[in-house]
């Protein structure tokens, strides 16, 4: 009988050959889990030991779910869609994919849900690929400092709280104070840039509606369409009737759509309206998943919820195409309390805030921007030079007016300098009022703020200021090239300023107030001694 010899090399080769040629059957390859609990948009699934965090799972009826909790025996799944058809005992399968959305220029002018599906009845969207919702924000070396202006068309903001491309500027205030109006006006103001056809000027806009009424979203879409702004805007809608999971995901969907354009070297403006409702939706999801609650019952990672979203807004370096994504997150406060949990979180993440006061709104000061506590931390570097030149004195005039106004309420008589200061402050305050959906070009803003801070509105009645404004701008367009010079260069040179002074003075000689009297021309009327006293007070306040 021949002796049996065992060669390890042959055994090893046979095993390698078997392993390399092995193809598992579909049943062996596919993991199947079962629903053990389903309620309130949340499902608990047992099985699926290989499921990943944030992986998409598919239920029997085709509904998708997002794996958020990976416990030892169960997976906590947020149902993405209608959950009434999901019952205990149903099978659940892995998809092997993380949540992503389609992206591309086909989304311009469309209204989509948080999964990227069109809901406007205009057919399918032409896409250019897909982008994962959970993406790392650009690193420090991938960024560039904010240095290009993003004009909102709102005088109070562009002059005193400027925004740059790539900045995160919070809009915060009580309900019904005009937060959405500021964001929509900013989108409308990008139309001239879009119509120019210059890619370096064009700004694509994304409006993310979170927890809003369906009628409100429809009115926003109508306003954009009427103004011709819908062609460069995408609306991601997660109305109040949507499940909490959709409201939680909507901002990330809008961000993914915008990031696609940003990494192509284009400029994007994204509005999150509003992140308070996203935080509430995330709180609801977390409590249903039995995550431990923290302050105000929010989960411990609610700060990370917003920081990882807003850090995606950036100005990219030249090596990455120099694209940008500017973020305008909106936060709703209760009783003007900016020190609450979510407002302070988002204030600490963003590059500045525009605070809207309900008292100012009710006093008909609209937009109701509280200049005192509103700030832009990085926008000053991006501000148009001509605007920066005229806005410095505007801040000083308004600050002095506010302090003097409070004092004047209790004073029986005031000196001439104080009365002149109050008059100018009232004129400037009236000048900064602006109706909704009426953004101003930057050159128009520069001309009017220059006129106000140089005293050319001091003898104009408050009721006549807006008529004076529109007629003056019309006069400057027809008879001078001042506005074109400011628009093309962004500067207010000595020559341009002299031409502007001549244009304003010639117009004042023809402007009649509501009483029918010509207000006159030349230098603004004021007593020389009073001006000296006023200047001395300004110098003293600056030194103090």
UniProtKB/Swiss-Prot annotation:
The record marks 374 as: Required for activity. ATP binds at residues 173-180. Signal peptide: none annotated. It is a peripheral membrane protein. It is found in: Cell membrane. PANTHER family: ATP SYNTHASE SUBUNIT ALPHA, MITOCHONDRIAL. Produces ATP from ADP in the presence of a proton gradient across the membrane. The alpha chain is a regulatory subunit. Belongs to the ATPase alpha/beta chains family. This is ATP synthase subunit alpha. It comes from Beutenbergia cavernae (strain ATCC BAA-8 / DSM 12333 / CCUG 43141 / JCM 11478 / NBRC 16432 / NCIMB 13614 / HKI 0122). The gene is atpA.
